[in-house]
């Protein structure tokens, strides 16, 4: 018995698209075959998750599933192969024609040519910020359904071929009288395919496809952002009976960086400096993500939180890679700790020699604070 799609993804029936996508990505990452090499249970879960998301992400398929459950897609199953398969565009026409045809006694219709589009697949990939900066070509292994090479996709044993169904005569549907109505339904013998296989292919067991790990080369462009989606047309599951292959979607996530934080095409970096450097001024060297160094001059009296902008030292823009964002340096002044007696005495001497011009903000603040409390005391007397 099939598990409820909502239970598979761990969401409620009322969840929105954002929560649905988030749940799918989390589970797909957890059970991805690359992270669970040789684990058949993880591979089964991965495909089960993909099947559930393939239905629930599409408003029409989701509505049909909410109304009919798994029965909404049973007519399109091919009896085997990848659980991702069987969600072709023509499937929902069959569902509603079956539903209304059985009530209203709809007329006979011609069977389609039987071609079914392969299912779309997804792959989660994590890249470093450096890789997002420069771009890369990655090799991935993706489990998918491919056309059986033993029977060339016919599903029949070598030397034989599928036969026209003797029950529906190739139409894929049969009609029966029920009272005053003529009811048309899917052929119970060929399950709507219009043909039967007497001698199934021993390799694919008549399913026309087999499971295979494929190695693909994926181009990651410079400037990609977290949650970028790359579509590889035709790299999903193989179609059935000459139908087109599905697509492969690469979902990218960018790892957090040790030094840089990203906001769009801009980079931000916090740099700690000593209290002395902040007071007397100085300079330091910083490298951007392409390894080019730049010197940052710190003027005398630099305050904590001051920001310096290095123009054109940020990330390349995805669709205008010749244009780069900026790098922002955020200054953090580090207060000295574990002072020696001599250092303590020098600081105390410095404090005695200081006046309000050395610390205008703190002097002004405490003067105003003193005046504030004096006013309160005067009112209470």
From Swiss-Prot:
Asked if the Swiss-Prot or TrEMBL record annotates the protein with the keyword Cytoplasm, the reply is yes
Give the J domain ranges: 4-69
Where's it found, cell-wise?
Cytoplasm
Q: Which Gene3D superfamilies match?
A: DnaJ domain, Heat shock protein DnaJ, cysteine-rich domain, Urease metallochaperone UreE, N-terminal domain
Please name the InterPro entries in this protein's record.
DnaJ, DnaJ_C, DnaJ_domain, DnaJ_domain_CS, HSP40/DnaJ_pept-bd, HSP_DnaJ_Cys-rich_dom, HSP_DnaJ_Cys-rich_dom_sf, J_dom_sf
SUPFAM superfamilies this protein is in?
Answer: Chaperone J-domain, DnaJ/Hsp40 cysteine-rich domain, HSP40/DnaJ peptide-binding domain
Pfam families on file:
DnaJ (PF00226), DnaJ_C (PF01556), DnaJ_CXXCXGXG (PF00684)
GO biological process terms, alphabetically, are: chaperone cofactor-dependent protein refolding; DNA replication; protein refolding; response to heat
List the PANTHER family: CHAPERONE PROTEIN DNAJ, DNAJ HOMOLOG 1, MITOCHONDRIAL-RELATED
- State the family it belongs to: Belongs to the DnaJ family.
- What the record says about its domains? The J domain is necessary and sufficient to stimulate DnaK ATPase activity. Zinc center 1 plays an important role in the autonomous, DnaK-independent chaperone activity of DnaJ. Zinc center 2 is essential for interaction with DnaK and for DnaJ activity.
Q: Which HAMAP family match?
A: DnaJ (MF_01152)
Q: What is this protein called?
A: Chaperone protein DnaJ
| Organism annotation | Bartonella henselae (strain ATCC 49882 / DSM 28221 / CCUG 30454 / Houston 1) (Rochalimaea henselae)
């Amino acid at each position: 018995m099939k598990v409820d799609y909502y239970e598979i993804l761990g969401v409620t029936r009322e969840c929105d698209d954002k929560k649905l996508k988030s749940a799918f990505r989390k589970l797909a990452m957890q059970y991805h075959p690359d992270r669970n090499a040789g684990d058949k249970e993880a591979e089964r879960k991965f495909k089960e998750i993909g099947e559930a998301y393939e239905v629930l992400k599409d408003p029409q398929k989701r509505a049909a599933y909410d109304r009919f459950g798994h029965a909404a897609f049973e007519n399109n199953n091919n009896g085997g192969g990848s659980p991702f398969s069987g969600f072709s565009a023509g499937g929902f026409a069959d569902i509603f024609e079956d539903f209304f045809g059985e009530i209203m006694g709809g007329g006979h219709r011609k069977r389609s040519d039987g071609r079914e589009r392969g299912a779309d697949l997804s792959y989660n990939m994590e890249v470093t910020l450096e890789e997002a900066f420069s771009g890369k070509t990655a090799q991935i292994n993706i489990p998918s359904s491919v056309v059986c090479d033993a029977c060339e996709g016919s599903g029949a044993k070598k030397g034989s071929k599928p036969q026209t169904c003797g029950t529906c005569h190739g139409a894929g549907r049969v009609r029966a009288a029920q009272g005053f109505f003529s009811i048309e339904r899917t052929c119970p013998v060929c399950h709507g395919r219009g043909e039967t296989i007497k001698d199934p292919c021993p390799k694919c067991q008549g399913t026309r496809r087999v499971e295979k790990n494929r190695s693909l080369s994926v181009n990651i462009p410079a400037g990609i952002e977290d949650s970028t989606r790359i579509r590889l047309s035709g790299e999903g599951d193989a179609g059935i009976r000459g139908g087109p292959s599905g697509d492969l979607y690469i979902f990218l996530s960018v790892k957090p960086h040790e030094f840089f934080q990203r906001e769009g095409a801009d980079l931000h970096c916090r740099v700690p400096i000593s209290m002395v450097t902040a007071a007397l001024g100085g300079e330091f060297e910083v490298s951007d993500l392409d390894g080019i160094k730049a010197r940052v001059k710190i003027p005398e009296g630099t305050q904590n939180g001051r920001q310096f902008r290095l123009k054109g030292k940020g990330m390349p823009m995805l669709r205008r890679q010749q244009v780069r964002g900026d790098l922002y340096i955020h200054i953090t002044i580090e207060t000295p700790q574990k002072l020696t007696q001599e250092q303590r005495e020098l600081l105390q001497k410095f404090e005695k020699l200081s006046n309000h011009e050395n610390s205008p903000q703190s002097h002004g603040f405490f003067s105003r604070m003193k005046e504030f409390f004096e006013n309160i005391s005067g009112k209470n007397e």
